[in-house]
Amino acid sequence: MVTQDIPAVDIGFTHEDFAALLDQYDYHFNPGDTVVGTVFNLEPRGALIDIGAKTAAFLPVQEMSINRVESPEEVLQPSEMREFFILSDENEDGQLTLSIRRIEYMRAWERVRQLQTEDATVRSEVFATNRGGALVRIEGLRGFIPGSHISTRKAKEDLVGEELPLKFLEVDEDRNRLVLSHRRALVERKMNRLEVGEVVVGAVRGIKPYGAFIDIGGVSGLLHISEISHDHIETPHSVFNVNDEVKVMIIDLDAERGRISLSTKQLEPEPGDMVRNPEVVYEKAEEMAAQYREKLKQQAEGLVVTE
């Protein structure tokens, strides 16, 4: 048997060539990109994610959700496939850092902008209060309710854990400002059952130099000093005391600003009755309100010329 030496063939393909080939077909991932990846390992500090890069990307536990996460198992499962946001460039080991929180954050702002456009009412639980107001979460975002927009007789600190209906006042992603109003939500709900020219019974809850604030079924309306009486009044204190029960007429409903304007002046049978004898005004309230509504109707029909 004859054996023949076969010369070794130089295939000319080195490790360097293989690395160059990988680089040639490697996708260049950039911070800000959204990619699809697969979870292949969960660790106490985060998770390793296969996104098709040469090195597994890392998802820190603090980037797993817009909400607080204690461990990766709360959010992810091995082999789960989902979207990830590339948070930073490769480190010295060639590893990218990913985020789910950033995706949820962007989508949350998109959602609250949509809700604001729809003038939607949302509900959220107060999780903390401070000197300025109360804090809530909307779609995972932290929102603030100024104290002036909290319509409740409870102390602010007693609101923690309570769910409130809310309207949007300001949605500004660039400044990270999400401001809401409890008062507007209540006023809107109340406004749907109120009409201009309607007489309502309320209680005086506050008195300022410019007028009195009247509680009418859980929402506050303003009885401006100019709408108390036809007679000149130096101060609302000369007519009202806090906790007085009063009859007032609604003269304006401003849903956009969440304001209810009230009047006793329009209910006076004779100018100055509210100063001299309020009981006469309250007794004749429905009769005077009917005249006021008729006047509004005639004005709308162009039958009355206003001065």
Curated annotation (Swiss-Prot):
CDD domains: S1_RPS1_repeat_ec1_hs1, S1_RPS1_repeat_ec2_hs2. The keyword ATP-binding does not apply. One of its GO terms (cellular component) is ribosome. It comes from the Bacteria. One of its GO terms (molecular function) is structural constituent of ribosome. GO terms for biological process: translation. SUPFAM superfamilies: Nucleic acid-binding proteins (SSF50249). Residues 32-101, 119-183, 197-265 form the S1 motif domain. Signal peptide: none annotated. The keyword Oxidoreductase does not apply. Coiled coil: none annotated. Keywords: Repeat, Ribonucleoprotein, Ribosomal protein, RNA-binding. Binds mRNA. PANTHER family: 30S RIBOSOMAL PROTEIN S1, SMALL RIBOSOMAL SUBUNIT PROTEIN BS1C. Belongs to the bacterial ribosomal protein bS1 family. This is Small ribosomal subunit protein bS1.
